[in-house]
């Protein structure tokens, strides 16, 4: 049986209006930029298991300006062909209490896992918990920005980052992984970390020139769907992440708020010929998936458990 979502706003990753129980973001700032100087290690062997932690000593690693990679002409630091790449960037937070949201942007080829102070905050095209240096991502993926596209937006779960981010020095660490290993003809590793600030005073660097996040609040649930900057086709379905922002005790919900109701992998495609060719707003068929991309039942907004949704 298929169920239909009701009263959910679908957002596309700005201006904030209205506040009602949610700290209002005044503006956005950049904590980490792709063209910062990163420490990096070419992944042709396994690193220390603590490489992403704040206590790890990376003084023996190479350093270079991001993005880092080879083969696409979008790399400030060019490296040799490799199976994967490990990167670390330290940054300073000056007023933690003023930060309301974190957004990670990633332009990558082919998969990645990102860590904040040693804890995972985002991943794409990786379906194993801790990928080894020679892990092979499930699918091939090309970077977008050098082709005129956009970086992928990841809203970092506040329930996670709030317990990680500290005043003073922090570490963003990213493992970027090639499909087909060192035989791959290219690799792209470009990452940014932005924060939404509630005060009018600028504390950190200005956001990237292209930064744009659709900020608003809603009295009904907000549905975030991330297809990693891939266009949703008629067929076949593509992979993505679906999140629902909803709290029974809140009167308003923000697009950058905690996805406390649901976070799940999905496969999504356009649904119905009328949706594609007649109506300006498309209908979609969604199948929910577990960590390993197997079918899984979910119960969004206390609806009956199901894996197929429209």
Question: What is each of the regions a protein language model found here?
Answer:
Residues 1-9, 14:
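Bacterial N-terminal signal peptides that target proteins for export
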Residues 24-55, 212-219:
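GGW-centered surface loops in extracellular recognition modules
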Residues 38, 61, 91, 97-118, ...:
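Aromatic-lined ligand-binding clefts that engage carbohydrates, nucleic acids, or primary amines
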Residues 54-90:
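Surface-exposed, low-complexity/disordered Ser/Thr/Gly/Pro/Asn-rich loops and linkers
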Residues 127, 139-211:
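An acidic-aromatic loop/edge-strand motif
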Residues 187-310:
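Phosphate-handling architecture centered on phosphoinositide signaling
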Residues 88-98, 159-163:
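Extracellular and analogous surface-interaction loops
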């Amino acid at each position: 049986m298929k169920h239909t979502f009701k009263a959910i706003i679908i957002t596309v990753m700005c201006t904030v209006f209205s506040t009602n129980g949610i700290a209002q973001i005044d503006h956005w700032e950049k904590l980490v930029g792709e063209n910062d100087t990163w420490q990096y290690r070419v992944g042709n062997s396994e690193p220390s298991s603590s490489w992403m932690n704040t206590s790890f000593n990376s003084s023996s690693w190479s350093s270079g300006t991001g993005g880092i990679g080879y083969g696409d002409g979008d790399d400030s630091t060019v490296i040799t062909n490799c199976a994967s790449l490990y990167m670390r960037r330290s940054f300073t937070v000056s007023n933690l209490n003023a930060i309301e949201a974190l957004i990670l942007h990633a332009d990558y080829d082919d998969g990645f896992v990102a860590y904040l102070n040693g804890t995972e905050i985002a991943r794409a095209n990786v379906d194993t918990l801790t990928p080894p240096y020679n892990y092979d991502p499930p699918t091939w993926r090309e970077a977008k920005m050098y082709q005129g596209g956009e970086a992928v937006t990841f809203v970092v779960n506040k329930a996670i980052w709030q317990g990680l981010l500290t005043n003073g020095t922090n570490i963003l660490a990213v493992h970027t992984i090639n499909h087909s290993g060192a035989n791959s003809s290219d690799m792209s590793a470009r990452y940014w970390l932005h924060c939404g600030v509630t005060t009018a005073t600028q504390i950190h660097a200005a956001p990237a020139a292209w930064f744009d996040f659709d900020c608003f609040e809603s009295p009904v649930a907000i549905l975030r769907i991330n297809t990693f900057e891939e266009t949703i086709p008629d067929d076949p379905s593509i992979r993505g992440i679906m999140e629902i922002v909803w709290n029974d005790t809140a009167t308003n919900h923000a697009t950058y708020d905690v996805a406390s109701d649901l976070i799940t992998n999905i496969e999504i495609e356009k649904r119905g010929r009328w949706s594609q060719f007649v109506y300006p707003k498309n209908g979609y068929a969604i199948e929910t998936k577990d960590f390993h991309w197997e079918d899984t039942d979910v119960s969004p907004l206390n609806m009956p458990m199901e894996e197929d949704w429209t």
